């Protein structure tokens, strides 16, 4: 009986600790929102994909070129499905980010901000399921430079998560296709359809 009590009490304390942390996070709601959209001339049909907001204090390069796995700038993402041209996708404190978990954790100050949309493609699997994923377009699975994806102009903004503020970002720029290098005397490129695919 004492062994069970020794196991149950730490488990209950752990659950309470997690619950209290979640309540504190919920109480720290941010009034800051980012509204990301794209015009019809950039992408005329509804799209499924992931919308990103990227933030930096460094004006030397576009925020999208400062995103890194380690020591990168803060950015947040939100999945969208059937997003129409001109329709806004809202990125708020519920959107998951890295290295800052939520936009409510942004220190007040001046930043350069950019919106980005990673357009997904539909894949019908042999088991009958359909999945939406990023389609490689010869960019090496780097969605930040993948043809067809869209990005906004960089805006300089003053941000204070404690103040009510909606920053609108219009992704009107489309990343162009990657051109294949020309054939040479020694290198020829061919395409063929696999019978298995």
Region spans (language model):
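Bacterial N-terminal signal peptides
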Residues: 10-17
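Bacterial Sec-dependent signal peptides at the C-terminal "C-region" and cleavage site
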Residues: 17-30
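Short amphipathic, basic-aromatic surface patches that mediate peripheral association
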Residues: 34-43, 57-63
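Short acidic/polar inter-strand loop motif in beta-rich domains
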Residues: 60-61, 117-134
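Short Trp-Ser/Thr-centered turn/loop motifs at beta-strand boundaries
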Residues: 78, 133-135, 140-141, 145-147, ...
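A beta-strand/beta-hairpin structural motif
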Residues: 81-102
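A short tyrosine-centered beta-strand micro-motif
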Residues: 105-122
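N-terminal cap/lid segment of alpha/beta-hydrolase-fold proteins
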Residues: 158-197
């Amino acid at each position: 009986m004492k062994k069970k009590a020794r196991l149950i009490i730490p488990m209950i304390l752990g659950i309470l600790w997690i619950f209290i942390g979640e309540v504190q996070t919920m109480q720290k709601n941010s009034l800051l929102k980012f509204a990301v959209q794209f015009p019809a001339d950039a992408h005329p049909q509804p799209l499924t994909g992931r919308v990103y907001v990227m933030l930096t204090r460094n004006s030397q390069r576009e925020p999208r070129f400062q995103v890194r796995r380690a020591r990168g700038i803060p950015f947040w993402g939100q999945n969208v499905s059937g997003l129409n041209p001109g329709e806004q996708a809202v990125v708020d404190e519920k959107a998951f980010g890295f290295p800052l978990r939520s936009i409510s954790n942004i220190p007040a100050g001046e930043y350069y901000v950019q919106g980005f949309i990673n357009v997904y493609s539909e894949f019908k699997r042999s088991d009958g399921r359909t999945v939406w994923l990023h389609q490689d377009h010869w960019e090496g699975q780097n969605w930040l430079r993948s043809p067809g994806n869209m990005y906004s102009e960089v805006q300089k903004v003053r941000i204070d998560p404690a103040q009510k503020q909606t920053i609108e970002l219009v992704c009107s720029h489309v990343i162009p296709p990657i051109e294949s290098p020309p054939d040479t005397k020694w290198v020829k490129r061919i395409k063929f359809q696999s019978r298995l695919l």
